[in-house]
């Protein structure tokens, strides 16, 4: 009996050891799998080294210390104030976390800073004095973030400044790397084949954002006037006759190559056809040497030049824009970077640029070693809707119809997800070229077809047809139809009309949906779950109108309603010209009856969850998770119970973790930046008292779209959040604020009682 007992005990002991061994082996495999997957995406488990979380721009973290059971218990760990650094339109930056430090940029100066992730104290700050190039930079805001690079012993923070310089800073000290460029800085205006000249501030007339160059070439001997802040201060830059250049998004680092693009002037109200075109360049991450340059407006003789037909001007004397002003994604294993490209100049009229205008409105896959195009796909031909591509695509490895596929999914202003094999560029689901309405504006020649994705279903409303109008009673339908027929109608890609009704249609406006803000735009975009293949799109949906009118004081035959005459760089006004009131070309028609939108409410905008293994739409929820009842005193709606609509507009800003999809409502969702936090730059402090309409962060079940928890936050988030693990604690950090009151808020779980854990397995990664 003793023997048998001993045998049993030995057996149990051996079994117990086996269980432990199996558990350790499984845990090791899971840990290795997590680390391996993160490494493939260019990240380190528990870190956030790219604007989009990783090189694939998944906005995904495998952390789950913060989960459904404790999300509502999150509390403010610290707030970091950027107030002493200057003002900003609104704070649109997503920080990075790497090797124990948090990195951000702030304000129109684009000050780079390292922050202690535990206390919120500033470790270092850096700013480049750019003189006139900063003072008159066309896109001064905080640039959405920065980039990070490390080869092991060396760590660098990569900053693109408002005045268009590229800097490599020691991540530990903030000191520019003396081996990079000149004293740590590369002048990005150099290497473009355009002459650099002394610059001077131009004060010869009124200036409206995005109009002609805000500076000119300096005159011989011209001096700087520190009181009036005009004249020349020694700043060197591209000759202003070529136009304006800037940057509005961080670079991305792929296999020791820094990939950076440019922004041109806004296309709303340009005066000149000629402006700086878009391009992508690669720089050596160690030395700053320019390795290659890819032209997004093909130069004569290059692939795609034939898509700029007779009458189009390309080259340094040609049409501007086609700039890639958004964020980028990359596949380090394939040596490919995926570039979402904007549109050519100008936004609503293209009579000066006949043709499809490559590489405008395209996703372009570029080899980071050579700068050569691997493949491209143009999502909008000859854009006249301001449908530039504003956001990095999302990369996933999924199985479709039993076949492993490496895919790239591009969200757009158009309200569609365009999905491709990221190796070959082949569409995953058909995108047939579909006939669309043609422009009747003199001189305009629109594309006869546009590619329309068959899957996934759109996340934003497109166009306006009779079936889209409210029809709760015959009288309501008649009233809505009367309003709708005042403008040109159609299913999608409806071209602009002339404000004076002189075009053949006789109509004075055209419906515009989605509008210039999308769809998705700079504030929204998608997060991807590499474990399940789900894609979570934070978008918006709406209806507007678009018109054109003659523009005698610009080089364009037509433009959105405005008065160019008298602005810097404008052509002389014609004899007898009467000054016009400045208006908007994107919202000129009535879109409501008695406060009720004429468009039927649909499950669009908000957040849409897609299964990218099938292209199916799995769920939808409104921004903020709340619908509101529409009421009106209009007698037309007497006795009609109107369907609810989302209570919060705008674009949700989404990320996802191992168990949750987490989002903030964005600028539309609450008290904005009206209340601040912290004192000096980088000061950590307690959250101030909050108003009753305090904004929240939301936790969602990724599989079902059901809200599982919320937590109140001091200020509404104004950019995409991020998350990381530091010293065994998971944090969520987001930007807040506008004007002179901006900063970062960090949330974490309360300290656990001695001997207990906060929960979840994320603290082991």
How should each PLM-predicted stretch be described?
Residues 48-52, 88-111, 137-165, 202, ...:
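Repeat-blade elements of multi-bladed beta-propeller folds
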Residues 13-23:
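Bacterial N-terminal signal peptides
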Residues 61-103, 507-518:
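Asp/Glu-centered strand-loop micro-motifs enriched in Gly/Pro and often flanked by an aromatic residue
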Residues 26-65, 448-478, 674-683, 754-765:
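N-terminal pre-domain segments of enzymes
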Residues 70-83, 112-136, 166-241, 273, ...:
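Extracytoplasmic/lumenal domain signature
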Residues 45-48, 55-56, 82-84, 97-98, ...:
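Acidic, proline/glycine-rich low-complexity intrinsically disordered segments
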Residues 329, 450, 454-542, 553, ...:
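Long, low-complexity segments enriched in small/aliphatic residues
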Residues 1-7:
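N-terminal secretory signal peptides that target proteins for export/translocation
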């Amino acid at each position: 009996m003793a023997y048998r007992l001993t045998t049993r005990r030995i057996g149990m002991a051996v079994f117990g050891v086996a269980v432990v061994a199996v558990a350790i082996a499984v845990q090791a495999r899971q840990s290795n799998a997590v680390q391996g997957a993160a490494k493939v995406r260019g990240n380190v488990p528990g870190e956030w080294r790219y604007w989009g979380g990783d090189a694939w721009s998944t906005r995904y973290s495998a952390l789950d210390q913060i989960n459904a059971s404790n999300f509502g218990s999150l509390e403010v760990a610290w707030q970091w104030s950027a107030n002493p650094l200057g003002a900003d339109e609104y704070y649109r930056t997503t920080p990075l976390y790497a090797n124990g430090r948090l990195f951000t940029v702030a304000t129109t100066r684009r000050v780079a800073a390292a922050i202690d992730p535990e206390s919120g104290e500033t470790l270092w700050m850096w700013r480049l004095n750019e003189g006139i190039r900063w003072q008159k930079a066309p896109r001064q805001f905080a640039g959405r973030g920065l980039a990070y690079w490390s080869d092991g012993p060396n760590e660098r923070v990569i900053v693109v400044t408002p005045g268009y310089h590229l800097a490599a800073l020691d991540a530990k000290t903030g000191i520019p790397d003396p081996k990079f460029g000149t004293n740590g800085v590369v002048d990005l205006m150099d290497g473009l084949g355009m002459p650099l000249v002394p610059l001077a501030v131009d004060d010869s007339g009124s200036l409206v954002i995005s109009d002609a160059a805000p500076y000119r070439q300096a005159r011989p001997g011209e001096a700087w006037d520190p009181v009036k802040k005009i004249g020349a201060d020694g700043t060197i830059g591209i000759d202003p006759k070529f136009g304006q250049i800037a940057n509005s998004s961080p670079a991305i680092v792929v296999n020791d190559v820094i990939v950076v693009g440019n922004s041109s002037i806004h296309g709303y109200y340009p005066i000149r056809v000629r402006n700086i075109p878009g391009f992508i360049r690669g720089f050596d991450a160690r030395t700053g040497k320019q390795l290659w340059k890819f032209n997004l407006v093909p130069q004569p003789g290059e692939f795609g030049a034939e898509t700029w037909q007779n009458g189009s001007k390309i080259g340094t004397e040609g049409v501007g824009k086609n700039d890639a002003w958004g964020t980028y994604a990359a596949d380090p294993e394939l040596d490919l970077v995926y570039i979402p490209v904007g549109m050519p100049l100008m936004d609503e009229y293209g009579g000066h640029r006949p043709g499809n205008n490559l590489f405008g409105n395209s996703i372009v896959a570029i080899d980071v070693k050579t700068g050569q195009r691997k493949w491209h796909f143009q999502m909008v031909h000859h854009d006249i809707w301001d449908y530039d591509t504003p956001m990095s695509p999302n990369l996933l490895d999924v199985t479709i119809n039993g076949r492993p596929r490496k895919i790239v999914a591009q969200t757009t202003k158009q309200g569609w997800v365009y999905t491709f094999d990221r190796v070959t560029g082949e569409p995953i689901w058909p995108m047939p070229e579909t006939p669309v309405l043609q422009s009747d504006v003199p001189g305009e020649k629109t594309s006869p077809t546009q590619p329309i994705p068959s899957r996934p279903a759109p996340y934003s409303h497109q166009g306006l047809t009779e079936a889209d109008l409210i029809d709760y009673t015959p009288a309501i339908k008649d009233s809505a139809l009367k309003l709708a027929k005042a403008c040109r109608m159609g299913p999608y890609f409806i071209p602009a009309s002339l404000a004076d009704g002189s075009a053949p249609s006789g109509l004075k406006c055209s419906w515009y949906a989605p509008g210039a803000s999308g769809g998705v735009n700079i504030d929204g975009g998608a997060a991807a779950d590499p474990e399940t293949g789900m894609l979570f799109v934070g978008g918006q949906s709406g209806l507007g109108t678009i018109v054109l009118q003659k523009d005698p004081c610009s080089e364009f035959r037509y433009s959105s309603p405005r008065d160019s005459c008298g602005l810097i760089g404008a052509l002389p006004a014609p004899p007898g010209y009467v000054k016009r009131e400045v208006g908007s070309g994107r919202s000129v028609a009535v879109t409501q009856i008695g406060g009720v939108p004429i468009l039927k409410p649909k499950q669009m905008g908000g957040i849409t969850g897609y299964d990218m293994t099938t292209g199916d739409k799995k769920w939808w929820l409104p921004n903020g998770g709340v619908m509101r009842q529409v009421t009106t005193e209009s007698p037309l709606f007497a006795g009609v119970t109107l369907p609810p609509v989302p209570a919060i507009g705008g674009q949700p800003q989404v990320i996802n973790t191992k168990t949750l999809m987490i989002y903030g409502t964005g600028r539309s969702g609450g008290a904005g930046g009206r209340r601040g936090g912290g004192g000096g730059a980088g000061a950590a402090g307690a959250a101030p008292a909050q108003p009753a309409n305090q904004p929240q962060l939301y936790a969602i079940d990724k599989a079902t779209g059901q809200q599982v928890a919320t937590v109140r936050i001091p200020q509404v988030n104004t950019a995409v959040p991020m998350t990381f693990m530091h010293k065994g604690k998971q944090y969520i950090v987001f930007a807040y604020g506008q004007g002179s009151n901006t900063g970062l808020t960090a949330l974490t779980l309360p300290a656990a009682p001695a001997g207990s854990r906060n929960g979840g397995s994320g603290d082991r990664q």
